[in-house]
Swiss-Prot record:
Gene Ontology biological-process annotations: D-alanine biosynthetic process
GO terms, molecular function: alanine racemase activity
Protein function: Catalyzes the interconversion of L-alanine and D-alanine.
Name of protein: Alanine racemase
Entry superkingdom: Bacteria
Temperature dependence comment: Optimum temperature is 30 degrees Celsius. Thermolabile and psychrotrophic. Shows catalytic activity even at 0 degree Celsius.
EC class: isomerase
Length: 25
C-alpha cells in the first residue's frame, strides 16, 4: 500500500465522517 492508497483511504474516512456528522445533526 502505497502512500497514495493511504491518502485515498484517509479522504474516504473524512467523507464518511462528514456524512455521519450531518445525519447526527
Amino acid at each position: 500500500m502505497x502512500p497514495a492508497r493511504a491518502l485515498i483511504d484517509l479522504q474516504a474516512l473524512r467523507h464518511n465522517y462528514q456524512l455521519a456528522a450531518e445525519v447526527i445533526g
